[in-house]
Amino acid sequence: MNREERLARQSRIRNFSIIAHIDHGKSTLADRILEKTSALTQREMKDQMLDAMDLERERGITIKLNAVQLVYKANDGNEYIFHLIDTPGHVDFSYEVSRSLAACEGALLIVDAAQGIEAQTLANVYLALDNDLEILPVINKIDLPSAEPERVRQEVEDVIGLDASEAVLASAKNGIGIEEILEQIVEKVPAPSGDPEGPLKALIFDSLYDSYRGVVAYIRIVEGSVKPGQKIKMMATGKEFEVTEVGVFTPKPEKREELTVGDVGFLTASIKNVGDTRVGDTITSANNPADEPLPGYRRMNPMVYCGLYPVDTNDYNDLREALERLELNDASLQYEPETSQALGFGFRCGFLGLLHMEIIQERIEREFGIDLITTAPSVVYSVQLTNGEVQQIDNPSNMPDRQKIEEVEEPYVKATIMVPNDFVGAVMELCQGKRGIFIDMQYLDENRVQIIYEIPLSEIVYDFFDQLKSNTKGYASFDYELIGYKPSNLVKMDILLNGEVVDALSVIVHRDSAYERGKQIVEKLKELIPRQQFEVPVQASIGTKIIARSTIKAMRKNVLAKCYGGDISRKRKLLEKQKEGKKRMKAVGNVEVPQEAFMAVLRMDEPKK
């Protein structure tokens, strides 16, 4: 193609993504757009076409990004090339959203006509505004009996400040309003700007591992062009590769001779390691490199850690292989081997958030068939020692002695909760109970409120989301972002069995809630650990101070059964002998904690306040 042809093609490209809260109908709308532009034949079409993973279809959520090229014949007679980039809506994957938005010029904002604006919708809209995208509001699900499109239209104007007078009223399920949406994309979303002749700049917004071709990078070309045989360089790592093939997704991958400005597609270059194609990194040409990378790249740091151990210790190597494979596709997963006296060999893994953690666990159990035990999730604490050194602690058993600690800081998040008026009291009570600091409250309209709190991440990790949903009958929506570290009065609590510390059950807790939590755990263990021949104390301690205790009573053998009548001194001799034996047993006895007891303690919910 010469320069004129390239520019003419570039003016007909529209790159857009779809932003929505979970369950507002994003994947269904994507399906309708694919149908309307006849990207797929009727035979190939299935629901949630862009959600490839079984897990995504079951939970009805989008986890990995997908990008599709579509051709649409508009009413003005021209054929336009659309690139639809599907984004996840969940808060754990907000970095994925921000990268996919950076690859677009416009975004469809989908709002449910019955539910109105939710917390995650807002969070993603702000990301889109940060990336200077043209936002087109779409009010979806107008076929519902409870739909109130006019109220929602007003809400979009009041809460977000977008002009919603031209918002399309649509029902993705019934295919209403789809054509209007496509026409609006043609009219309102700007074509990509960028010099097709300039040095290559391409944004990596996702990558996956293919066992035949190595790493496949999903890219958006911002400037220049790329074709097979070209030498490319990653700007974050400085590594160089030779391109083997480029192409686009129509949802199926199709090879192309070159990708130019505005194209969204894939590139392979016999890259062996997903770590080399960091998401958000810029690809440039090795011979004619760009001066500076595209802005916005940052390394993702895990927020939540937990230990993963195979139930059957022989599965350790399989678990390592499973994690290696998942890491190929998921750059934000981190893991390192660790051992626990109680659970044997396993891995300490870092995740972006709780949903991310659950999904990884489920994928290991499903795709690799390994049964797992997971330890309680913990966050990264910053510990300042008396000698001035600062340590980052993600595992409670690595916490230094109390005498050496100057202060402990823990990560706080800013939580935005949207909730109907009736539940404001319940939500505020929950947040206060989780050591939340009240920041702000706004009434969005006569029946919905936005409440903002600062809450320690460790409290959210535990079971905040479940409690929020149950306290508000499922009506609250919730979004959080990390704001930094604050000092807290935190202590490490150990659980002792027969005087021995069980390392897998150590937790870091706030001093005020240590007694409650300790008492709960020892009571639970008392129920679940089988009785021994000798009595076993179960204790919770902070340092050397025991704060809670319960005792598993001994099983007793009746040694007097063989004395029919007879002298008291004879009986006493037998009882003394038994007592000696029990004492010796207790000194050398070892108490095994059964698997179920671990699972029960780690899954233990806090008492409802």
From Swiss-Prot:
Record-listed GTP binding positions: 23-28, 140-143
Enzyme kind, highest EC tier: hydrolase
What Gene Ontology terms describe where this protein resides (cellular component)?
plasma membrane
Compartments it resides in: Cell membrane
**Keyword flag Nucleotidyltransferase:** no
Task: State the EC number(s).
Answer: 3.6.5.n1
Name the membrane topology term. Peripheral membrane protein
Q: Which reaction does it catalyse?
A: GTP + H2O = GDP + phosphate + H(+)
Give an example GO molecular function: translation elongation factor activity
Q: Which Pfam families match?
A: EFG_C, EFG_III, GTP_EFTU, GTP_EFTU_D2, LepA_C
Query: In its keyword annotation, does this UniProt entry include Translocase?
Result: no
List, alphabetically, the PROSITE patterns matched. G_TR_1, G_TR_2
Every copy of the tr-type G domain together lies at: 11-193
Q: Which domain of life is it from?
A: Bacteria
- Check the record and name the NCBIfam families matching this protein: lepA, small_GTP
Report the protein's function.
Answer: Required for accurate and efficient protein synthesis under certain stress conditions. May act as a fidelity factor of the translation reaction, by catalyzing a one-codon backward translocation of tRNAs on improperly translocated ribosomes. Back-translocation proceeds from a post-translocation (POST) complex to a pre-translocation (PRE) complex, thus giving elongation factor G a second chance to translocate the tRNAs correctly. Binds to ribosomes in a GTP-dependent manner.
Output this protein's name.
Elongation factor 4
